[in-house]
Amino acid sequence: MSSGKPHLNLVVIGHVDHGKSTLVGHILYRLGLVDQKTIQMLEEEAKKRGKESFKFAWLLDKLKEERERGVTIALTYMKFETRRYIFTIIDAPGHRDFVKNMITGASQADAALLVVSARKGEFEAGMSPEGQTREHAILAKTMGINQLIVAVNKMDATEPPWSQKRYEQIKTILGKFLKSLGYDISKVPFIPVSAWTGDNLIERSPNMPWYNGPTLVEALDSLEPPPKPIDKPLRIPIQDVYAISGVGTVPVGRVETGVLRVGDKVVFMPPAKVGEVRSIETHHVRIEKAEPGDNIGFNVRGVSKRDIRRGDVAGHLDNPPTVAEEFTARVFIIWHPTAITVGYTPVIHIHTASVASRIVEIKAKLDPRTGKVVEENPQFIKMGDAAIVRFKPIKPLVVEKYSDFPPLGRFAMRDMGKTIGIGVVVDVKPMKIEIKTK
């Protein structure tokens, strides 16, 4: 595997049974960084059960089981390589915690692949009000995924098979919906494919001579690599803090924005502790500077392990991370059994922090499709609603405006073990905190 290629994170979304697993399985089978031995083992097992059961979805399920049993393919099982990129598929389709993982974006997706079935009735089910085609597309947009590819799947099962008319119909209906979410449709390829037969996945389909756009892999190769926000102020949400004997305090986290250099003075917020960076490591290699996307451990002098914790954020003294007295956000309610009113206090999961935050005002209810205000100061909001809401964290929490620092400005609301909603921060009222520099 040539490590020189840039890495892209791809999230695969779409309605249940529209063929996500089969499609991913087929691509992994053809391009995946899965060793031959594993593939052979799976194929032999398939032969034993009768050829028909070697479906690509079944391959994916087998790989998932292997991963859960901790077999060696754990790391590579969801990676595949194209001419230009190495792709990591975030979250295999059908994952229970799919929505939660997509939101908190532990590994933020650079692009989304939306799989829709062209089979009669199936496309319509995905587009119904409770359809996942709609829900996942809304989520992707809310979470800041601006690069989208649509795979119009099961083209072998249209009436008649390989129907251009059905493809055009889906492209029109779905295109209109995606446009209403704010996607630039001229940049969204719609690729007619069959995950089952492999048509238009890697090679051109002889069954659809009417289509002259890219194959799925060509479309994946034409995605843009994510920009590195090095010119923004430094932000490093802390994942863990270690005290290493003979070294000292070592916070660990991913640089989201800005650049960290050896010798820099940094401040950890909310505790307002200041330290000096003595060394930086990434994957056990010493480096002089760290940039966005780097997962690092850095040794700081002047700060003890007791002073800082997971959920704190490191920045430079001239532009410290913002601690919120209150923050205002655009939220979308995914699930709630009754109604949400002022006083409701879900746990806000934002960057590496999770802090209960009270709703102190529901400013407006929005049309989830257009974002326009439909009601000022509503009494309550419920499942399926979008709204502008003001929160007060019950203990100090670093929150930034989404427009300034996207990874520190999007969050999930959790309660009762479920994701209640997702949100993006539109405004922050900062808490006044004095930073003592010795």
UniProtKB/Swiss-Prot annotation:
Protein name, entry field: Elongation factor 1-alpha
Record region (G3): 91-94
Organism ancestry: Archaea, Thermoproteota, Thermoprotei, Desulfurococcales, Desulfurococcaceae
Binding site for GTP: 14-21, 91-95, 153-156
Enzyme Commission number(s) from the entry: 3.6.5.3
Segments for region (G4): 153-156
Role this protein plays: GTP hydrolase that promotes the GTP-dependent binding of aminoacyl-tRNA to the A-site of ribosomes during protein biosynthesis.
Domain tr-type G: 5-228
Keyword Cell membrane among record annotations: no
InterPro entries: EFTu-like_2, G_TR_CS, GTP-eEF1A_C, P-loop_NTPase, Small_GTP-bd, T_Tr_GTP-bd_dom, TRAFAC_GTPase_members, Transl_B-barrel_sf
Organism listed in the record: Staphylothermus marinus (strain ATCC 43588 / DSM 3639 / JCM 9404 / F1)
Ranges where the record places region G1: 14-21
HAMAP family (alphabetical): EF_Tu_A
